[in-house]
Curated annotation (Swiss-Prot):
GO function terms (MF aspect): DNA binding
GO BP, one annotated term: DNA replication
Organism: Enterobacteria phage I2-2
The protein's name in its UniProt record: DNA-Binding protein G5P
Keyword DNA-binding carried by entry: yes
Top-rank taxon, per record: Viruses
Membership in a protein family: Belongs to the inovirus G5P protein family.
The protein's assembly and partners: Homodimer.
Designated gene of the protein: V
Classification lineage: Viruses, Monodnaviria, Loebvirae, Hofneiviricota, Faserviricetes
Amino acid sequence: MHSGILIRGRILGSRTANRDNNSPQHILGVGIQKADGFGGTTQDVEQVKIPDQLVQSGVVNQINSLIGKLCEVPINVRSWSMNGKNGTSYTLSFESGIQEIEELIYVR
């Protein structure tokens, strides 16, 4: 069982970016659907850092098998402040894996 924060959204895939020290950083993309205020929906993309240890354990293969599927992603949240900038970063949690969930279809 997971205690903490879960992001629920559609898995978009993973990519690799370079950190400031030029080492690779793996990132998971999660699409979050939300109402657009006009009767439709739009999608925000949350970027979740993947720790090197999880990359080495094969989590990127799991992510690739879940592309396009609705999932719950366990994350750790960290606020930061550096060089006059502030932000929040999300990191994939070691506590539990990414879980595919059933899509609910609402009929009006």
